[in-house]
Amino acid sequence: MSSVAITICILSLVASLGLWLGNIKIRGVGLSIGGVLFGGIIISHIMNLPTVASFMQQKNIVLDSQTLYFVQEFGLILFVYTIGIQVGPGFFASLRSSGLKLNAFAALIVLLGGLCSVILYYLFSIPLPAILGILSGAVTNTPSLGAGKQIIAELGGEQMTELMGMGYAIAYPFGIIGVLLAMWLIRLIFKIRPERELQFFDKEQQRQKGLAGINIRITNPNINNILLREIPDYDLNTVIYSRLKRNDELIIPHPNTTLYLNDILHLVGNKKSLNKMQIILGEEAGHEPLNSGDSPIKNERAVVTNEQVCGKKLAQLQIQSQYDVVISRINRAGVELIPSDEMALQFGDVLHLVGRQKNIATVLSLIGNAQQKLQQVQMLPVFIGIGLGVLLGSIPIYLPGFPVALKLGLAGGPLVVALVLARIGSIGKLYWFMPPSANLALREIGIVLFLSVIGIHAGEHFFSTLLSKDGFSWICYGAIITLLPLLIAGIIARYYSKMNYLTICGLLAGAMTDTPALAFANAIQENNGASVLAYATVYPLTTFLRIMLPQLIAVLLWAAH
């Protein structure tokens, strides 16, 4: 049996044991994917026991170091790339309004964690690889560990990277528990009732909801007997006129449709734009879409799956003028958008269509609406994206005063490229849409491979370090790095910014890129969308900062000696 085959068998054993450990939960909290790390540590520890090591030597059972290295790096690449593809479209949209505040708090948590690490490093003379590993474990961030190992190796400390894995593993358990503890302490300090927080959040969401619909009866005599396109601000594309009801007849309005008093228009847009149009046109006549029992006008949702229309602007497709169908709104990666002539369609866009059933059917055949295509993965863009990400990660970034160039590395490069490509959506016939199930599968495979190798490398000396004086100290250092930044940011967010508690919980989980903590935050109050929204908003920027932070710390502290 070759060393490569033996290595793959051992990795499979580690992954199986680790995933089983991760599924064990105590009061709803478990190691989750972090169990793979401890599966690797256990297997590695057993393999290094004198009797087992002697037996393996006799039977010539050895692990192939090159295979382990490749599996570790490729697993990391898969993990960060799929994260970028998943959150890319929503990330740029989330940077508006409240997203800026949330990301500022997330950046504060990251920077405070780095500051705590540097202070502990100088106070207690902790080895540099160890404090970087403790930092990564304390914030439960695997890409951070990968970036730290890479920069330490490039600085000439490749032999010391094992310390990083041990520091990561020792600090990791409290990294998970510490986030939950911070959420509980903030709730206790401010005497918060989660059910009231959910009510406040729901009210705020209704007030700020992206797009809404309204019926407006034309009572302004200045609008009587003019064309739809002559309405003030029509060309700004801030609202969509999806239906017109005249007496008992329901029709699709066109730019050249003549308007009369007592006509009722159904408009779609943000609340500010709708209020403005109400002042111009007349009085509100309800919010429900206009319907008539025997009307042929229907509405339907359809998904863009035809590669021929991906990347084409709505002006080129002329859907309203040719097919008498209105696109009232477009849902892209969970973000609702007002259609405009200059907007280009992307694979996976969900269109809200209004028109006659026969005309809608024609539009459906044009845009695709093939649900099975949403389950297919186009592999060519995946490898193009990974290749571009690795190239970007290899470009040196020279900063004044730094002895070596920084790099985005194998963790940062693919992440940045994936975010950008997911935002672009498609180039020609290449589209970067990935079905959620496929994305999750690749992401889980990547993180399992990476953590399996990290665990194997860390396992040889893990238990001896854990049971030593250093082991207990490292746990304490990790607890400080975990808890202090979270409490400071959480208290500031609540006391000064009056941030919703459920949003704070999502912020803390996202700033630590901690999925188990998000699950805990969701369990605080059922049907809680606040935590998920905050988590998704800060996750991409946090991951990027977590990747860059250990590199900055490593270069600065290495140069200081």
From Swiss-Prot:
SUPFAM superfamilies: TrkA C-terminal domain-like. It holds the Pfam family TrkA_C. InterPro entries: AAE_transporter (IPR050144), RCK_C (IPR006037), RCK_C_sf (IPR036721), Transpt_YidE_put (IPR023018), YidE_YbjL (IPR006512). PROSITE patterns: RCK_C. GO terms for molecular function: monoatomic cation transmembrane transporter activity. PANTHER family: K(+)_H(+) ANTIPORTER SUBUNIT KHTT, TRANSPORT PROTEIN YIDE-RELATED. HAMAP family: YidE. One of its GO terms (biological process) is potassium ion transport. This is Putative transport protein DNO_0009. The chain crosses the membrane at residues 4-24, 29-49, 74-94, 104-124, 166-186, 379-399, 411-433, 447-467, 472-492, 501-521, 538-558. Residues 198-283, 285-369 form the RCK C-terminal domain. GO terms for cellular component: plasma membrane. Its main location: membrane. Keywords: Cell membrane, Membrane, Repeat, Transmembrane, Transmembrane helix, Transport. Belongs to the AAE transporter (TC 2.A.81) family. YidE subfamily. It is found in: Cell membrane.
